[in-house]
Amino acid sequence: MNWAKMRLAPWLDTRAKFVAGVPRGGSLLDIGSSDGETLRHFFELRPDLRFHSTDLAGMPENYPTGCRFHRGDIEKDRLPWPDASMSAITCMHLVEHLNDLTLLLAEVSRLLMPGGRAYFETPHPKTVDLPRIRDKWEGAFTMNFFDDPTHTKPVPIAMLAEKARAAGLEPVRSGISRNLMFAASHLIYRFARPSRAKFTAQVHWIGWSAYLILRKPG
C-alpha cells in the first residue's frame, strides 16, 4: 500500500499519524532501517521531509532518494549527526534485538531538537504466549516473539519509558500500534488459508506491537 493514499487520513495507522505530525520540511532519522520498507512508506506520506537512517547492515539502495545513511552499531557507536539536528526520530522493532539501550536513548536525546519527538515500536510482551509459526511459513513471518531467533527479550513499554526518562526524555503517549484497515480485514482473512496477508491482518487485529512516543523538553 502506498502511504500517499493516507495523507487525508493518517489517523488510520499509528505510525502514519506520528509521521504526519512532523513539522513541514523537518528532519526525520529512522534508527534500524533494515530493508527500508517502513522508511519508504514515510517518504510516500511526507516527501517534504529530509530523511536520515542508520542500521547495523541496512539496504541503502532501497531507501528514499536523498536519504543520508550511516552504517553503525547503536550499542557501541555514536551517530554522526550534530546535536539537536532532528525534528523526529523513529525506531521500529529494534529495542527487542539489543542487550543495552543506554547509548540508543542517549543518542535520541542528543539528536532531537528541543520539543522534538521520538516514536518507538516493539512487540508487546503478550507475543511470547502466541502460537508459533510452523510449516512453510516458519522463518517467513513472526507471530510468537521467539519466531524471530534474533530477538533477545521483550521490552515492556513501562520499562522503556523509565529508561527514556533517565536519558532526559519525557513520555508523551503509549498504546497499541495498529493499521485500522489491516485490523478490519482480519474479519475476512480469519477464514482464509495461511498467507502473509492473513498473518498481517491478524497481528493488527490482536495488537501485536506496542508503541511509545517521547518528547525532548524545551
Task: Name each model-derived stretch.
Residues H93-H97:
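Short catalytic micro-motifs in class I SAM-dependent methyltransferases
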Residues S27, G115-R117:
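Short glycine-centered segments of the SAM/dcSAM-binding site in methyltransferase folds
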Residues M1-P82, A88-M92, L105, S174-S177, ...:
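Conserved N-terminal segment of class I S-adenosyl-L-methionine
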